[in-house]
Regions:
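P-loop NTP-binding module
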Residues: 1-159
Length: 159
């Protein structure tokens, strides 16, 4: 496997995200995410867009990197942001946001093990709300396609 900068990963090595909040990040890297944010705002125009989904077809395509950095740039611009980790198989966002492992999250809310408010984490220093993936379920695809998922997203939109 290769990382974002073309270096081959060692077996068992965790990938590292390049967060725009890191003062060592090159100016061009940070500006690319700000440009993406601006372009999304421009494309939305007068539409009332409140939800973005970042996904990919295969692992290791940097969807987590894009999701977290786009969330950070949106929050930095004053928008209310809820970053939801729906990778129920191999969640990683909690690691980069220092949210702890096996905390309550999406899977726990959808299986009625906790409320949405109990699972949400306010990351005040980043100006965003984070909903971790939660406990890995045996049926991630089915869990995300149930009606409760849409209800959860609708509730988050109103917060």
């Amino acid at each position: 496997m290769w990382n974002l900068f073309g270096k081959k990963k060692k077996e068992g090595e965790h990938r590292t995200l390049q967060l725009i909040t890191d003062k060592k990040m090159p100016f061009g890297y940070v500006e690319a995410y700000k440009s993406l944010r601006t372009n999304l705002d421009f494309m939305a125009g007068s539409m009332d867009v409140h939800t973005l989904v970042i996904t990919s077809t295969v692992p290791e395509e940097s969807k987590s990197n894009v999701a977290i950095n786009l969330a950070l740039t949106l929050a930095e611009s004053g928008k209310k942001v809820a970053l939801v980790d729906c990778d129920l198989r191999k969640p990683v966002l909690h690691r980069y946001l220092k949210a702890g492992h096996n905390v309550k999250g999406v899977s726990n809310v959808l299986s009625n093990q906790c409320t949405l408010d109990e699972a949400l984490q306010e990351l005040k220093e980043m100006n965003l709300t984070f909903l971790p993936a939660g406990t890995p379920p045996p049926n991630p695809s089915e869990m995300l396609s149930q009606p409760q998922m849409q209800a959860m997203v609708d509730t988050l939109r109103q917060k």
